[in-house]
């Protein structure tokens, strides 16, 4: 089903000019003429100013943000959302892209940004899922990506030709721990998942057991 029409994606990467703004107004008008029943939206690149002529053209708006991966820290996402909302309470705001890479054979006891570990990816999505849960005024959030996917130009985490931001591996067979973060938030049926099962080689006398569940309590035997 078509839910809404997007008129552009990260268009300000190349800069802004009046012709660009005018074209977006023309596209908005055309969308409404062709289909007045659906909303229109735009996906702003992260560096797009929070005020300016590219805002309030479409019915709703979204940003592509990667704080905690390409730059900055994941904890910047919540404050940024709050600041934008305070400055623009009339704009219906969403997040059209967010994510970080996680490779299922990379693991860490001290996960951190850009280590490509499954553990860091899970921590990142734990934060983001809660950030959206705490802000009911966000109209939509779109994780990038459901599945790892091919990308010839990439060479990330020792893997060539693949973007590893998926919650599931490229062959659709292995659900990463980050997948179960969202299942714990959204699943109606009872679920439980013990994370870190692929992190088999660990140092130390004790280990932390992390569990994702939509139940109030779980018991580990």
Please annotate each region the language model reported.
Residues 1-221:
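Extended substrate-binding grooves/exosites of carbohydrate-active enzymes
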């Amino acid at each position: 089903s078509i839910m809404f029409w997007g008129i552009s994606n990260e268009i300000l990467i190349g800069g802004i000019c009046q012709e660009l703004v005018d074209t977006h107004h023309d596209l908005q008008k055309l969308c409404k003429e062709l289909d007045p029943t659906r909303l229109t939206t735009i996906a702003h690149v992260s560096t797009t100013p929070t005020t300016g002529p590219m805002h309030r053209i479409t019915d709703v708006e979204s940003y592509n943000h990667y704080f905690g991966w390409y730059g900055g820290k994941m904890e910047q996402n919540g404050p940024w959302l709050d600041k934008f909302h305070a400055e623009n309470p009339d704009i219906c705001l969403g997040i059209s892209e967010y994510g970080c890479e996680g490779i299922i054979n990379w693991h860490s006891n001290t996960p951190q940004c850009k280590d490509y570990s499954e553990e860091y990816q899970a921590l990142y999505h734990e934060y983001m899922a809660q950030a959206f849960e705490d802000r009911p005024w966000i109209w939509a959030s779109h994780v990038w990506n459901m599945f790892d996917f091919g990308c010839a130009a990439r060479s990330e985490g020792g893997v060539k030709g693949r973007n590893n931001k998926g919650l599931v591996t490229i062959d659709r067979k292995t659900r990463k721990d980050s997948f179960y973060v969202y299942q714990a938030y959204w699943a109606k049926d009872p679920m439980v998942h013990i994370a870190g099962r692929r992190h088999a080689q660990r140092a130390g006398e004790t280990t932390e057991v992390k569990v994702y569940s939509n139940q109030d309590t779980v018991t580990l035997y």
